[in-house]
Structures are given as C-alpha cells and as structure tokens.
C-alpha cells in the first residue's frame, strides 16, 4: 500500500531478524511515512517510571534504534529505570524516507541521545542522524554500532558484547552522556 499510494518511487522493505514485540501497543499503531515508534519509559516500565515523569526528572535519555537492536535497548532502558534514569526508545520504522523535522523536534526534548544500530558505524543511519543532530545544535549524543573490523564467530550476545553493544554497554553510554 505504501509503495502504491506515495510518490517515493522504488523502495525496499527490510525485514528485521526479530518480530515486533506484541506487548507494546505502539508497534500496532498505523504506519506514518518517515516516522518511527516512540516508546515512553512509562509504557516500558510503568511501575518505575511513573515517579520519573519527564517534568520531574533532572535528565532524560532518548535511545534511537533499529529493530534488530530493540531487545538490547529495552534491557538497558529497564536497567536505567532501576537507577532512576528516565529513558525513552525511538524505534526507527524508516531509514528513508525520514521525517527529519519531526526527528529533530523529538530529539531536542532530551538531554542525551544514544543511537544504537546493528550496522556498521561508518555510513549507517546512526551516523546520518547524529550529523543531522549536530547541524541542528544537538550535540550530547553517542553512536553505538559495529566498527569496521572482523568479529569472531559466536552467539549474538557474545558478538554484541565484543562490539560493545550489550545492554550493559548501552546503559554505560547513556550514563556517560548524563555526566557531560
């Protein structure tokens, strides 16, 4: 339907390795061209984030991720909530087209942004979005992605740990942004 009703020309549907989590109602919302899915902390860990409403917290983190890294980011978000750090997840539904204006308006509301993707850091969507943020005066961010090197065989968890993409590594990156 998207390809037939919009004037974007050819496009590719990238199927993630994992399915969308059915427990998060946001993943069932209608698709808006160029926009991802915002999962507020209060929806992810409602019992822990209620007292951490954004207006009452000192700092807020936004995780921007592709579908393949959602589970690691979700664990990091829950872990941060246990330490009284409010963090939301923005799951990218689109790489292109991307509603840049919407993304910048969203990103500007946060004290730090952690971009997490299962692609190569150089030339990936995280690099693109971090440059977009910098051009718009948003500078407290970090990019978590694979460096350009060979990784040994291993389980997904082992490879993510080697690439510093484990939930614990993602959490540490978020905490380091709050210290800036």
Predicted regions mapped to residue ranges:
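Thiamine diphosphate
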Residues: 3-180
């Amino acid at each position: 339907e998207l390809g037939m009703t919009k004037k974007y020309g050819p496009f590719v549907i990238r199927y993630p390795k994992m399915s969308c989590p059915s427990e998060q109602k946001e993943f069932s919302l209608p698709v808006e061209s160029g926009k991802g899915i915002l999962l507020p902390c209060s929806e992810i860990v409602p019992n822990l984030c209620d007292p951490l409403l954004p207006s009452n917290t000192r700092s807020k983190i936004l995780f921007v991720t592709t579908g393949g890294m959602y589970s690691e980011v979700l664990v990091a978000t829950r872990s941060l909530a246990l330490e009284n750090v409010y963090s939301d997840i923005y799951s990218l539904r689109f790489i292109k087209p991307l509603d840049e204006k919407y993304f910048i308006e969203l990103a500007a509301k946060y004290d730090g942004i952690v971009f997490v993707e299962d692609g190569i850091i150089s030339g990936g969507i995280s690099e693109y979005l971090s440059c977009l943020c910098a051009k718009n005066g948003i500078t407290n961010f970090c990019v978590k992605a694979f460096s350009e090197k060979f990784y040994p065989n291993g389980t997904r968890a082992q490879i993510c740990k080697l690439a510093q993409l484990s939930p614990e590594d993602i959490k540490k990156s978020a905490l380091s942004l709050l210290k800036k």
